[in-house]
Amino acid sequence: MEPEALALTLPIRRLVEFLLRTGSIDSRFTGFDRALEGARLHRKLQRAAVKEYPDYQAEATLKQDYACAQITYTLEGRADGIFTDTDGMPTIDEIKTTTLPPELITGEQSPEHWAQAQIYAAIYARQNGLPAMRVRLTYFQVDEELEFRFSHDYTADALDAVVTDLLTQYAPWAKRAAEWQRISRASLAALQFPFPGYRPGQRAMIGAVYKICTEGGQLLCQAPTGIGKTMSVLFPALKAVGQGGPVFYLTARGTTRAAAENALALLRASDAHLKLRSVTLTAKDKICMQDRRECTPEACPYAKGYYDRVRTALWDALDTHALTADALQMLARRHKVCPFELGLDLSLWCDVVIGDYNYLFDPVVHLERFFDTAGDYLFLLDEAHNLPDRARGMHSGVLAKSAFYDAKKRLGKGKSSLKNALTKVNDIFIEWRHRCEEAPGDSRFGRTFFEKSRADTLDRALTRLCEPLEIWLDEHRDPDETHEALLQLYFDIRAWLRVADTFDDHFVLQISAHGSEVRAAMLCLDPSDFLTADFAKGRAAVLFSATLAPAGYYRDLCGLPDARAVALRSPFDTEHLGLWCARHVSTRYKDRADSIAKVADLLAVMSGARAGHYLAFFPSYSYLQQVWENFTARYPDRPTLCQESAMNEGKRAEFLAQFQKSDGRSLLGFAVLGGVFGEGVDLTGESLIGAAIVSPGLPQVGPRQEQLRDYFEQTRGSGFDYAYRFPGMNKVLQAAGRVIRTPEDRGVVLLIDDRFLAPDTRRLMPPHWEQLRVVESAETLAGELERFWGRAASLEGKAVSSPAR
């Protein structure tokens, strides 16, 4: 019986780089931004070629099937140019930019460049019945702006032989990938839900996700805590992988990636026959195994010779199905390769890729190997309420005067073109400082002004600065403090110019001054157009969170006007949650001083009604500190814990560990609303039995927030809602969601501010908040809490712990 024929679509560039690339990882300064400068120079050379050769076709798409070793390959790619040379020979032109010194550009330094062009020539010759083709490599040396051309003529048979040889080398990889896909798809088709039953709402969520993943489109899914969101999106997406894939599980925070890893581990444990390969992409600084990250062959043994060893490492790694950060580091040590780059290379061989939002949405670091063109991908976005703000940040740019002044000082005395260029940029910032001094506002807190157009004068000065800065960086490669400062400045300038190229009426330019410092910021007010284009790169997308209301707001800002939306009810018994609003307190900025003691009293009553752990969330650090000082002075016997303004991962873990202790005592934690403890924290059972949300969480009124308000008032007619009310209520609901994490949990939530009762705010509350009750004093709250905990005790059939002392 003949073996079943395999079919595989393969990008030509990926094929040749995979098989032929050698050498080391070297992330040192290369003299130009490869993506931007390379594309610009390609276009420049192509325009010149069109003038030289009238029939020159730039960016010509080529696609052809080849059969080799019982595999049918569909090879596809884009030739930089196809033309008829002066002697009548049809020619493929492959253009490469390089920073190699001119004397090292021989035409033989990169075999993969020849192979790429030879495959293009083989396809063109086959499709046009040509007996021979010419292949030309055009190298452009960017520092000297010199062009080098190298040509070879080949018969069509010789070109076909090159293709056959490369495909024969690739055949073991293709067969392994095809065999994995066959058994993986079969095992996923047979995969059963890993639990004996479904939680309330879970079946509906699974059905909605499966429908989107199979039919295509986008889904906004609001799923309260307890439904099991992670499994409810991963399970149906994996069942639908035969209709598309791979699956990208994207998160806003590194801590939530563990939820996806745990869900996949549970699926594997529930089905011994499941064949599912996943990789977790971890930030380079976190997964680096060196004491100091320096990605050069001289400094890092894992970078040196990476491309010589990576294929052996990949072949070995494909036997590991859960490629977590720990697994990648283990493999990297075994094969002496970089774990970060290994994870990226492995992503092409995986069914599930877990990583940060930026791998899809950030124009600088998105995964080019997937997203330079559209594919049959499934996107699952956890904590999707964070996407609009994250996207704004990805498409904004910031520069500070001090960075240019500091760079100039570091260069010492003496004149140079670099110092002159830095001075011209610095002078622009000084002019802006004078304008800021004339702007309205209190100079003690800084002054600012806005423009609706980009900073053309600055952009021109920055463009002129790039060349001498590149020359200096190329001549000073030792990684000392001055080099690092100027290299970071160069990257910041490039990032700024990249944003400037996209500046339109969705942006605003802000210039602000405080003392001698001046900052320029291009602020992306509305990222929806960018997100629309990003989502179009996949087959389907599911955006899910406990807080995606109102749906129209998220459809709008996420660039998904046609997305379906589902909102599921909480699966928990509403009797388990005690919910009150303290109407007698105003936390408006003008009323803050009068509110401090009242808030402290309410917190004392809440945390004293039953021994346990509580969190109180505040709109700012300063307000938090004021209430904490009042509380600890008046209730010195109550244990408290205070979030600090800058906490590393270790300190955050220590903070949360205090809530895991079961010592029978009360603990009241003070945290910032919308901060690291306000979402993505899972404290079940007695770890957290109450939360107070102090204020409706409206973002602080300021120049930037008012720009958002004005923009959305003009474009949507809902300025206050888009800039203040909706983001604020989202933070409130996230913080309140820290209480009641399992069906057995019981807890209380206290909303402190009369504005929670405004009709427009009440409309944003979820259905399971229907039992919201109003209290007018701390004494009234004490009575309400006594009754709530008394009912809870009778239902539990045991005595409630005595009040905290």
Language-model region placement:
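Mg2+/Mn2+-dependent nuclease catalytic core
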Residues: 64-160
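A substrate-engagement module of RecA-like helicase motors
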Residues: 185-186, 192, 245-353, 361, ...
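Walker A/P-loop
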Residues: 214-236
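Conserved RecA-like P-loop NTPase helicase motor core
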Residues: 583-594, 644-757
